[in-house]
Amino acid sequence: MKIKESSYLRRQKPLLRALVERLEKKYRYCSVLGADCHAKRYSVNASGVSAATDDLFTQRGFVVRVVDERGYAEYSFNQLSEAELSAVEAKLEATLDALAAALPAGSSYMERPLPPDEPLTFQGATECAVHPESLGDAEILERLTAVRKAGLAVDEKVIDCGAFVNYQEIHKLFLSPNRDLEQDLLW
């Protein structure tokens, strides 16, 4: 089965595309990176049984980047509405103004090459035989418990045996004036 696309990214994509279209009129370069990633970890050992969201690998939101003669600016957010498009533009503008104002007299922004933006479209998804979510926490923990018991049964000298599993479902979206890239994968 193919990993399904993120409904969160799908809902926000038209507004993100509109934001890129607005920003490309003002800046030499602009892009938006969106992420919707969910991770879970399971463990069974002598100290107990655990099924929990892995906060380190769970993320959701967007980062917009622009470049002009004043430098680079980035702004991150979790949701976007049509009413907020102008506010995002204003935040980027304020960041670039602050960068320019912070430069010492007589110095200027160090010119760097712009990120590549040749036309490219990509939509890819990994496939998996069984998605961990379809098993459910109870089934995963039951299987890990069986693995732990089998490990303990190998030899009476085995004091403890732990069984652990993590998974992360990753959804990414990258938009620029010439690029529309999406990936959905399970790791």
Regions found by a protein language model. Give the residues of each.
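Active-site bordering "gate/hinge" segments
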Residues: 1-187
